[in-house]
Amino acid sequence: MTMIQYPLYENPYGDIRVDADTVIGLHMFTAGENDLASYVTSFSPFAVKLQTYFRMFGIRHERVSEQTNAVGPRHKIPFISVGNTLITDSGLIIDHLKTVLGDPDAHLTPAQKALGRMVQGALEDHLYWIILYYEFFSDSGWDFLSNVMVGGATNLPAEIQEALDLRRADFRKRCYDQGIARFTEAEIIDKAKRDMAAIDVLIDNKRFLLGDDRPTSHDAVVFGFTQAFFQVRDMHPEITDFVRTLPNLGRFIATVTTRWYPELKLAFEPHQP
Ligand SMILES: N[C@@H](CCC(=O)N[C@@H](CS)C(=O)NCC(=O)O)C(=O)O
């Protein structure tokens, strides 16, 4: 049997020069123009993570709103451009920028770095699938989101509706193949609650995941993957109602939103410290 040969894009790090004055193109899916855009910057957690990293650490950039992942060098969004050169993957981009613009994690102890890495793994490889489940697999999540984004899939021209249906079917299959869609919704809700309750414990009474005085790259990850659970209740009401009872993670979402996303509104009342 012949195996499919998948293309592999190598990031051309050697072809870009970035310094403090460089304006980097940040290509991402944005929330679009709708009621939810006042509460979240994007429904893509990797995009929110990268944009938050850029804002937290003052990296000059201009946002480019992409409509399809096909334009990404690995067919994934987000990616960055410096001139015509493209670098992909939020994690690889952050790693590279740390080497050329300074590393906001340099002061962390090995144990803190290890903890940050494990939290990142849980969010990007576990909680992410729950996000996809609500965006694509669940009828209620899909109906809610497509209503907000395009005013309901049934109002669209037939060919666009068909393209959306195909995309949804593709992501539903991925959710089933990965395994998340083999759990009941009650089990999925429980999994999401446990991930975020664990982060709440780890933040404790600090301002950020790993300290009180300044954020690290891990805070951009936490914000990217948990913001919508706090801000967009109608996608997943049971999860949102639970996470809004978490005092430390809720305070964290409020801190990051007010400090780095002054244009956004908070959809919930954070607990007072
Ligand atoms: N590891 C990548 C993941 C990016 C990713 O999965 N992006 C999603 C949007 S949230 C995407 O482009 N999906 C399109 C697809 O998989 O077809 C990163 O950190 O940038």
What does each model-found stretch correspond to?
Residues 2-162, 230:
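GST-like domain detector, emphasizing the conserved glutathione-binding G-site
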Residues 44, 87, 106-113, 182-189, ...:
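Generic detection of long, well-ordered alpha-helical segments
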Residues 49-56, 96, 191-202, 255:
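Amphipathic alpha-helical segments that form well-ordered structural scaffolds
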Residues 118, 122, 166-170, 184, ...:
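Catalytic cores of nucleic-acid editing and processing enzymes
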Residues 129-248:
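GST-like fold's C-terminal all-alpha helical module
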Residues 229-273:
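Long, positively charged, glycine-interspersed low-complexity recognition regions
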